[in-house]
Amino acid sequence: MKNTKQLNDALEHRILILDGAMGTMIQKYNLTEEDYHGEQFRDWAYPVKGNNDMLSITKPSVIDEIHRQYLEAGADIIETNTFSSTTIAMADYHMEDFVYQLNYESAKLARKACDDYTAKTPDKPRFVAGSIGPTNKTASLSPDVNDPGYRAITFDELRKAYKQQAEALLDGGADILLVETIFDTLNAKAALFAIDEIQEERGIRIPTMVSGTITDASGRTLSGQTAEAFLISVSHLDLLSIGFNCALGAKQLVPYLEAIAPQTHFRISAHPNAGLPNAFGQYDETPEQTAEQIKEYLDKGLINIIGGCCGTTPEHIKALSDLAKDYKPRKNT
């Protein structure tokens, strides 16, 4: 991986800024069903509005513009538009056969944007993180309360799907693979197993970020793990970072970051939501409010990589970038 040394050097010297939300940014464009179909899928027989990942193919200018807004705001790392780009998640749209193209084209878009900004300021290299979401199925829990032993997906089916996604992201130019929004650690382990297979087959080391989701005030993931248990579950791996994203706002994440910080030599990341959604599912937290809460992470030395999830905008990321400049990154234990 050609940019790994630059990435590690940057992490040694400063807190890196991850980008913010993709989905809520796309909503602002008010795209139509026709926009989603584009030219390639003009005659597609199924409705696809809401399948944001396909916009990397059908409306690349929209995705490129969002990437560049985040880079302009100060992001060091931008995520590919591939959160749902596995055969498992794409089955909802009957688009399993296009998964390689979705991931490859998304990574290429992000790569070009990053390279353009790195060329402007070579002392601040930008990096592409291939976004790998949890899929819409869980390997640990039954979807049927009347049949607790039933599973909608197997570990090997997940491994195969994740491997296809990861290979395409790497082929398209990703520097990092980000396994994120993990609600079921068994799903994540399938992704990490697939990444390890690729490392072995290609003879490379892939910087891998792992980011779990604490679903509510219970302090646990959906599959029942505490923050500490989640950390232990993946601590045998060689990870670039571990952390949390989504579900909660910045303030609510503090105790979980504090729980893992003394117990790991991994770098720590966080990309919380812009607070909690209101009654209409919208996020009201301003960039200033988010930054004020994130300041606690920095004051306590908890963080190496910081960004935003649902509801965050380039303005939120600029506020975080401006704030983080005055702080040193967390030192590994």
Segments the model singles out, each with a brief description of its role:
Residues 1-333:
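Domain-level signal for soluble alpha/beta catalytic cores
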